[in-house]
UniProtKB/Swiss-Prot annotation:
One of its GO terms (cellular component) is plasma membrane. Keywords: Cell membrane, Lipoprotein, Membrane, Palmitate, Signal. Pfam families: Lipoprotein_3. It is found in: Cell membrane. It is a lipid-anchor. This is Uncharacterized lipoprotein MPN_011. A lipid is attached at C20 (S-diacylglycerol cysteine). Belongs to the MG439/MG440 family. It comes from the Bacteria.
Length: 231
């Protein structure tokens, strides 16, 4: 059976899985209790490095006992984080890559849709669209192309991820030491201007190096979404 998550404002009330962070925390506690008999205060565990390692250890046991339910919980965390505009993919923060340490502009980002389908955690695919607004904090010039302080430019990015079948997800992906739950995916984005001027910004400035990006093996850390929802 293939499951599908459709994340749009109109559909948010009828999502297949739990719709709020409080419910997610309860689902996590119940999963661990069902598979290991432990009644944990997960909100306290994630405060410390040791607590996070303990929690990943329990999740690893849960996956070994009930992989389907643990998969559902992990993907639910990813889905709910996306609803809150937390993509959690460092490569996707392209503005930091371009102007590292420089406050050249402010970026606002909103997830328009985040569609996920899966048969199992090793067969996950995501298609997403994000809206970006850049507000320039200073004048900027590049090869004769001038941008003025206060200018705003608008972009859409189209993101595709797919789990790598040649690196299947197993209990070994629950890395207690590094505090990561690793999912290997192929990663592709395309960045487009929402209007003629914004597209020209992409074509004529250093942003043109980020119009398209492809990575064959990128490690998603699924644990960061659990932490994000519970903190």
């Amino acid at each position: 059976m293939k499951f599908k998550f459709l994340l749009t404002p109109l559909l948010s009330s009828v999502l297949f899985l739990s719709a709020c962070s409080a419910t997610f925390e309860a689902d996590l506690k119940n999963l661990i209790k069902e598979t290991d008999g432990k009644d944990l205060d997960v909100s306290k565990l994630i405060i410390t490095s040791e607590g996070k390692q303990i929690l990943i250890g329990y999740l690893k046991k849960s996956y070994e006992v009930n992989s389907e339910k643990t998969t559902e919980l992990l993907l639910n965390a990813w889905k709910q984080s996306a609803e809150k505009n937390e993509i959690g993919i460092d490569l996707f923060n392209w503005t930091k890559s371009i102007f590292s340490g420089v406050n050249t502009f402010n970026k606002k980002q909103k997830v328009e849709y985040f569609n996920m389908t899966y048969k199992g955690i090793s067969d996950v695919s995501v298609k997403a669209k994000l809206n970006h607004t850049l507000t320039w904090n200073e004048n900027y010039s590049y090869r004769g192309f001038n941008i003025h302080k206060g200018d705003k430019h608008y972009f859409n990015s189209f993101l595709t991820l797919k789990a790598n079948s040649y690196l299947p997800f197993t209990s070994k992906n629950f890395d207690v030491y590094s505090k990561r739950i690793r999912l290997s995916v192929s990663f592709h984005w395309i960045l487009k201007g929402k209007d003629e001027l914004s597209q020209k910004i992409l074509d004529k400035t250093v942003l043109n190096g980020y119009i398209e990006y492809i990575v064959d093996n990128y490690q998603i850390n699924l644990f960061r979404y659990l932490v994000y929802l519970i903190e």
